[in-house]
Each structure stands twice: as C-alpha cells, then as structure tokens.
C-alpha cells in the first residue's frame, strides 16, 4: 500500500488541478457562472476546447474569419454568444442549430454580405440579434420568421437597399439606421409591439402614414439625419411617443405648433442641427412632461420673440442638452453668444407698447419686431437710450418676416462673407474668409490672426449618463446604450468599476466588457446596499476628459427568489487558482505523513523479524550456524535504562544475562506496541 503513494500523488494533483487548468481554452479567461472571455486570443476559428457547461462565450475581436458546422458543437447550454469585431464573411446554413438555448447573438462589425432563410435555423429562443456594421446587401424573405421570441433586431450601418416584410410579433426594438433604404413601403413592418424604431440616416424625404399603421406601442422614434423638409404629419398621430429625434434634417426651417400637437406624452425632443431661427413659444403647453431638449447648432435669430427661452429653461425642470453649442446667429451684436446667457434687454425688445419720447441726440432706430404678448413691459429710465445703436453699415441686421423656403443651406447662414455648405450627414458648416472665425464666421480676427477679445465661454466637459436599475437584491443592471451613443472615442472594450458605499468593504472591483453590450448586469452584490458604478474606455494611458460616466444605485432588501439572471461573471481567476493550490498543499502533507508512517512501520517489522530468529541484514557467523549469542549486559543495561534498537524501536532488556555457557536461548526483548 505504501509503495503506491508516489504513484497516486500525481494522479490526485491532476484531478485537483484539472478543472482549473484544462477547462479554460488557451488565451481565454474563465469565471463563474460558466463564462468564457477570449479577448487576448487570436485565431481564425472559434476555440474548440470550450467547457460544455459554458453559458456565456465572448470571442470578440479575435480575428475569426470562418465558422463551420462544428464550431459550436457540444455547447447545449450556451445562452450568450459574442462574435463581434471579427472578419466573418459568411454564415453556413444551420451553423447555430446546436445552440437551442441561445438568447443573445452579437455579430456586429463583421463582413457579412447576406442573410438566408437557413442562417438562424434552430434558434427558437433567440431574443437579441445584433447585425449592425456589416456589409449586408440582401436579406431573403422570411429570414427572421422563425425567430418567434425575438425582442431586439439591429441592422444599422449596412448596405441594404430593400427590406423584406418583417413579421416579428414580440419585437420591441428595430434599428435600420444608416442604410440605403430611400423609401419604406407601407405595411412592411408587421411588428405590433415595437417600442423603439430607429430610421436615422436613410435619406428619407417623407414618412408614409401606412408605415406606422400597425405600430400601436411606439414610444421612441428616431428619424434624424434624413432629407425631411418639414415635420412629417404622421408624427401627430403617434400620441404615445416619449422620445422624438429630428436632428440633422437641415431642410427643416420652421417648427409650427400644429406640427407637434398631440404629443403630450413627449419627454425628450431633439431638434438640433436643423435650420431653425426660432422655437414655438408654448413648448411647456405642447409638452407638459418634457425633461430633455436638444436644440444645438441652429442659426437662432436672438430677437424679442425668442426672449422667453432662457427664463423658461432656467425656471422649468427641462434639461438643455449641449448648451455650449446652443448659440445665437443673428443679429450680429448677439452672434456667437450663448442663448442661455442673454438677458431680456439683449433681445432688443421694445421698452413699452407705446412710443416713448426720450431726449437724445441720436435718431431712434427700432427693431422691426413685435412685442410678445407673454412678456411684461420694461420701463426705461430717462438716461437710458431707447434702442441700441445702429449696426455698422457693412452688415445689416436681419428682419423678422416669413421663414425662407427650405433649402439645403438656408440663406444668410454664414456671416461676414462666409460660404455655407453641408458636411457629413448633412450638417451645416461655414467656410470663413480670412480674418473671421467661428461656427458661423461671427468672430473677427485681429492683427497677427489673434482672436478678438470677445469672451469665449469654455466648453464644459460632456456629460455621459448611465442607466442603473436594480434587478434583484444582489444585482444591478447598467444600461450602456446612452454611454455608447454619446462617447466621442472609438470604443473597443469598456472598463466597468463598482464599489460598495454603505458596507465596510469599499474595495474597487474592475470588470472588462465588450463595447457591443447594450446593458450589463452586475451580480454578487450585497442586499440593501448603495453602489457606485463607473464606465470608461478600456485602453492604455489616461481616460480622455469627459469619457467617464458614473452613477449610484441601491439594491433592494433581500427576498427569497429562485431566479438568478445569467450574466457575465467577474474577470479574473483568483478563486480558481486558490482552490487547487490549497488542495495540492493538503495532498502533499498527507503524502508526507503516509510516507513517514510506512518507514516507521517497516523498521518495526524488521526488528520483530530479527527477534524471532529470522536472518536480518546484520546477522553474524554464529547466527548463520543456528546458534544465537546471548545478550551481553551493556553499560546502559546495568543502569536500568531502555535500549534503542538500530531500527529505532524502543525495547525492554533484562538487567542481567544468564550465567550458563550460552547454550540456552536468551530472554528475548519485547518491543513496545
């Protein structure tokens, strides 16, 4: 038995360390619950040695070029598969069929050209399918019809020129942005429950009413960066809208109250980068629930009819997005100034409703504007001039009259002789002549191309937001969609950090996430605790200014629940490394104790054999003849002490030998038991 210990020890060590060493593919990181991150691995195929109990597999940015029928064999429990940012050009028929439990599939940023009826065969439980940023030109009719449980479908940034009818009764989000779909046929969307529809950057000139006839549950509509010349009339019928994005439709030069009537539920409105010179005066009446307004990069004419805007923003609960880019264009005395920084007097409103006679040596020049009925009159003191001094003759102030006809680039957009043109995605831009600078060439340069002393308001850091909400007493869901949309850097991976603010352990925990995730659930938290969560780009060097978003959330008290959401686990294999190491140390200690016991037992058995007359290793000539020499009393025997055998066993020996001639057998020693 003891001789087998050296053979069993390596086997026991292999069994103890096997799951931690052999269960994770090379170049990957494995963590619980059953999540494999292959972020540093480079290979043209999917790793083959993935543990069969894997729930989440992340192989983004691995250089994968092809998939075959056996790429995902032996992974029946896989629920989340991230293949984004690879070089996959085609998907074999039925390649995902072994993944019967797959719910999330991310193929963003590959080189796919076509989607067939067999591409997603067998994915009956698929809920999220991301196909954005590919080269897809053709989708066969019925390619998604078998995906009965699909909730999100993203096809943005492809090369689609036509779209087959979509019959997805459970779909909640559909993103078709930035394709070449110049028109969408009525009835093409059989998605009665869709909540968010994104049609940005398609080049649409109008929206057909039949397109929205079945969208009874629409809350979020994005039609930005198109060629719309006015607010589509069909929008008035979407009374459930809470978010509307019209940004980048540079041909829209006017917002009429009747265009937006019936949208009382609206909470977020984006009318930035249009050609607006004014805004409807009754925004609070039109949108009583409005929380966020974006109106940046419009050529506003900051005269009296617009004087209500600043006080309304400051006094209401509405947040103005990008206030540093919401500036005046006209008149020249206000050009380039922040709209929120203007006082009532800066808008050139008449002091009274009647003409006042004020002694002055200069002629009175009034702005050709009408007094807003909602503004209270302001009385002038006798020492104050009635109006501002006339503008320099080189640039005459514009008058308030009929809004010009919609054009690609509205007239008088650029000041001081600047040339207006449309930039990328139809954004207005001005080419300024020598000596002038600014968004609309409103600032004059001095000698030596030094800017004029006009105060320039420093641009505050951008505010990126996170949506954090509790999922269970031990988990928080972090919404990354707004952060990804608002970030100005190219994101490949994200760093998510969190810490417990209400507990004794406030150590920072860091996770690495792919940039393709729209949300992430942080698990293994403490119930009834407040956590701080931050997200930032992952990369060497310092985080760019304004690219870190943080938020706080509180987990609810503990409740009995049998459901735990399947999410990605923490990065790092520290628990998997500690457990095998402790097992190895314990096995080594047990082996050492067993070996020592075997050695002592062997020596004791050898001593017993010698006492019984067996020939031992140290037998003399007389013992070979069958004659045993009597024990001679040694020095220790005369002292009455015990004598130690060569084998190490302690024995009792007689105090005196037999006086005979030595023919009788001596008294044998009795070893201790």
From Swiss-Prot:
Alphabetized UniProt keyword annotations: Disulfide bond, EGF-like domain, Glycoprotein, Leucine-rich repeat, Membrane, Repeat, Secreted, Signal, Transmembrane, Transmembrane helix
Residues the record marks as carrying a glycan: 101, 117, 273, 500, 528
Topological domain ranges for the Extracellular compartment: 24-575
Domain LRRCT: residue ranges: 298-351
Fibronectin type-III domain span: 460-558
Disulfide bonds: 409-420, 414-430, 432-441
Stretch forming the signal peptide: 1-23
Molecular functions per Gene Ontology: cadherin binding; transforming growth factor beta binding
Major site of localization recorded for this protein: membrane
Matching SUPFAM superfamilies: EGF/Laminin, Fibronectin type III, L domain-like
Residue intervals annotated with topology Cytoplasmic: 597-673
Any one Gene Ontology BP term: negative regulation of transforming growth factor beta receptor signaling pathway
InterPro entries xref list: Cys-rich_flank_reg_C (IPR000483), EGF-like_dom (IPR000742), FN3_dom (IPR003961), FN3_sf (IPR036116), Ig-like_fold (IPR013783), Leu-rich_rpt (IPR001611), Leu-rich_rpt_typical-subtyp (IPR003591), LRR_dom_sf (IPR032675)
A single cellular component GO annotation: extracellular space
Stretches forming LRR repeats: 52-74, 77-98, 101-122, 125-146, 149-170, 171-191, 193-214, 217-238, 240-262, 265-287
Tissue expression pattern: Expressed at highest levels in aorta, at intermediate levels in kidney and placenta and at lowest levels in brain, heart, liver, lung and skeletal muscle. Within the aorta, the strongest expression is found in the tunica media of the proximal ascending aorta, the descending thoracic aorta, the abdominal aorta and the coronary arteries. Within the kidney, expression is found in the interstitial cells.
Membrane topology according to the record: Single-pass type I membrane protein
Biased composition (Pro residues): 390-404
Record keyword Glycoprotein present: yes
Known role: May act as an inhibitor of TGF-beta signaling.
Assembly mode: Interacts with TGFB1, TGFB2 and TGFB3.
UniProt name for this protein: Vasorin
Originating species: Homo sapiens (Human)
